[in-house]
């Protein structure tokens, strides 16, 4: 299965391959960026399929807390030491953290070299690996330093998902739920009824999510409008992750909580029915995802929104669902209305 992304009025683009890893062929030097856990589980599978002139491995620490400029420096140092040039290629082999960091390193090494995404987590396959968002975190928030830099190809393999821990697998489902709530009511209904034990259903889930992401990115590559709707749940989630030091919740878990918080705000504003909000909450519960976060200080939580990348001139832009299958951006919500919702989570 192949899905094509055409960008900048079809001047360039790339393919997302689903269960076609054997097609991967690269000219020139190749650096595979991964972590010890993924390497131990899946590196041999990749190397058995990879056709390239020369490769070497860059191993980085595992975890969101290492998604920072220090790790980027580590990657760049090894690229320089190994004398990669502009004809070389980086492979991001891992989850969303690896994808984001490798893409960012590729975008700044010698002002840009090729990179390929091979996501090994469900979260990365349904969302993070497609679309060209790259970056790292800092003390001010999540993904505050980064770039838009598209991969040359993406390879999604269902077999890599078999080794995911229960919690990590479910965290990936949060991003699939996000896709469904914002753009695809039929997909939402399918998720309500499907069991994901079968590999064909997993492949269908990835395919459907990638199709949504691809069409959105084609229409709005640099997130000036439509693509911003895919940040549903993330305005709240990024604050939660930053407050908890990126250690208490996996990203998808924080997004699940963020979606529930956003839905509470939507209901209060009359954008969403309580019935739809409950259906979303029940679907998240079906996938054993959290929906509640105990706030310490609602005012401090709100002030953290000011560092959100969508905030402009002191106006917080909230991505809210106005019914399953649809979403809107609102930048005229009163602070008091948001504070009242936040108090429900104390």
UniProtKB/Swiss-Prot annotation:
GO molecular function: 3-dehydroquinate synthase activity; metal ion binding; nucleotide binding
Keywords tagged on the record: Amino-acid biosynthesis, Aromatic amino acid biosynthesis, Cobalt, Cytoplasm, Lyase, Metal-binding, NAD, Nucleotide-binding, Zinc
Any one GO cellular component localisation term in the record: cytoplasm
Keyword Zinc: yes
Essential cofactor(s): Co(2+); Zn(2+); NAD(+)
Name of the protein in its database record: 3-dehydroquinate synthase
Source species taxonomy: Bacteria, Pseudomonadati, Campylobacterota, Epsilonproteobacteria, Campylobacterales
Reactions catalysed, as given in the entry: 7-phospho-2-dehydro-3-deoxy-D-arabino-heptonate = 3-dehydroquinate + phosphate
Cofactor-binding details, from the entry: Binds 1 divalent metal cation per subunit. Can use either Co(2+) or Zn(2+).
Pfam families in the cross-refs: DHQ_synthase (PF01761), DHQS_C (PF24621)
InterPro entries reported in the protein's UniProt record: Dehydroquinate_synthase, DHQ_synth_AroB, DHQ_synth_fam, DHQS/DOIS_N, DHQS_C
Location relative to the cell: Cytoplasm
Residues at which Zn(2+) binds: 175, 234, 251
Annotated NAD(+) binding sites: 62-67, 96-100, 120-121, 133, 142, 160-163
Family: Belongs to the sugar phosphate cyclases superfamily. Dehydroquinate synthase family.
Pathway: Metabolic intermediate biosynthesis; chorismate biosynthesis; chorismate from D-erythrose 4-phosphate and phosphoenolpyruvate: step 2/7
One GO process term, biological-process aspect: aromatic amino acid family biosynthetic process
EC number: 4.2.3.4
Function noted in UniProt: Catalyzes the conversion of 3-deoxy-D-arabino-heptulosonate 7-phosphate (DAHP) to dehydroquinate (DHQ).
């Amino acid at each position: 299965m192949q899905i094509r992304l055409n960008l900048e009025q079809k001047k360039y683009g790339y393919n997302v391959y689903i269960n076609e890893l054997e097609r991967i062929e690269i000219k020139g030097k190749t650096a595979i960026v991964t972590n010890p856990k993924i390497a131990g589980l899946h590196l041999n599978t990749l190397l058995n399929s990879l056709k390239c002139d020369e490769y070497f491995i860059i191993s980085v620490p595992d975890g969101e807390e290492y998604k920072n400029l220090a790790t980027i420096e580590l990657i760049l140092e090894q690229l320089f030491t190994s004398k990669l040039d502009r004809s070389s290629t980086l492979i991001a082999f891992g989850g969303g953290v690896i994808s984001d960091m490798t893409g960012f390193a590729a975008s700044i090494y010698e002002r840009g070299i090729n990179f390929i995404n091979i996501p090994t987590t469900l979260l990365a396959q349904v969302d993070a690996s497609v679309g060209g968002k790259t970056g790292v975190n800092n003390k001010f928030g999540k993904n505050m330093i980064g770039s838009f830099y598209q991969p040359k190809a993406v390879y999604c393999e269902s077999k890599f998902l078999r080794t995911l821990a229960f919690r990590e697998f479910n965290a990936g489902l949060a991003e699939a739920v996000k896709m469904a709530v914002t753009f695809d009511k039929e997909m939402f209904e399918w998720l309500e009824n499907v069991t994901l034990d079968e590999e064909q259903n997993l492949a269908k889930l990835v395919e459907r999510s990638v199709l949504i992401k691809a069409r959105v990115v084609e229409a709005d590559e640099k997130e000036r409008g439509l693509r911003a709707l895919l940040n549903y749940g993330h305005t709240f989630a990024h604050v939660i992750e930053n407050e908890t030091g990126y250690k208490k919740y996996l990203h998808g878990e924080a997004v699940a909580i963020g979606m529930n918080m956003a839905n509470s705000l939507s209901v209060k504003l009359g954008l969403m029915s309580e019935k739809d909000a409950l259906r979303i909450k029940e679907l998240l519960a079906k996938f054993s995802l959290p929906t509640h976060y105990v706030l310490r200080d609602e005012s401090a939580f709100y002030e953290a929104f000011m560092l959100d990348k969508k905030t402009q001139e002191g106006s917080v832009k909230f991505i809210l669902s106005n019914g399953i299958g649809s979403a809107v951006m609102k930048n005229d919500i009163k602070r008091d209305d948001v504070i009242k919702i936040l108090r429900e989570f104390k």
